[in-house]
Amino acid sequence: MTSRGINKVILIGNLGQDPEVRYIPNGNAITNLSLATSENWRDKNTGESKEKTEWHRVILFGKLAEVAGEYLKKGSQVYIEGNLQTRKWQDQNGQDRYITEIVVGINGCMQMLGNRASYDYTKPEAKEWNKKNKNIINEKQDIKESKKNKIEEEINFDDDIPF
């Protein structure tokens, strides 16, 4: 086995702000997330409950970036699987700056967690269709019920069965 190492990050947290989506010239989406993870414990000396929150910068690419931009919002709970990456650049004063990010690319994963009601899965056109056609669906259900009742009336189980 080689000793090249493993670079994998798994986080579950909540978004601190709405996703920031941008598109690069080739049309691919890039989305930045600000993800909070919290750790809770009880102080042994005082018995007081403590909490420590870490903020993570997450970068999504491609289709995952588009999905995140469309469905996630501030407060959304999300599962992230990606790689740790540190970038270096120079600021206006020529000083070296560094930022560490979790990059979710082709081999990464993003899953929406939490209450399904907090996500808007249907497109606006689908919502309109549902509103307009709700009565039709209800009518079809009523027809099925009336057919079922009619069939039950036609079948008479009171006849003598010879066996």
From Swiss-Prot:
Pfam families on file: SSB
GO molecular function term, any single one: single-stranded DNA binding
InterPro entries: NA-bd_OB-fold, Primosome_PriB/ssb, ssDNA-bd
GO biological process: DNA recombination; DNA repair; DNA replication
Keyword DNA-binding: yes
SUPFAM superfamilies: Nucleic acid-binding proteins (SSF50249)
Keyword DNA-binding among UniProt keywords: yes
Entry keyword set: DNA damage, DNA recombination, DNA repair, DNA replication, DNA-binding
One GO term describing the cellular component: nucleoid
Ranges spanned by the short sequence motif Important for interaction with partner proteins, renumbered to the chain: 158-163
Domain SSB: 6-111
NCBIfam families: ssb
Function according to Swiss-Prot or TrEMBL: Plays an important role in DNA replication, recombination and repair. Binds to ssDNA and to an array of partner proteins to recruit them to their sites of action during DNA metabolism.
Subunit structure: Homotetramer.
Protein name (record): Single-stranded DNA-binding protein
Lineage, highest ranks first: Bacteria, Pseudomonadati, Pseudomonadota, Gammaproteobacteria, Enterobacterales
Gene that encodes it: ssb
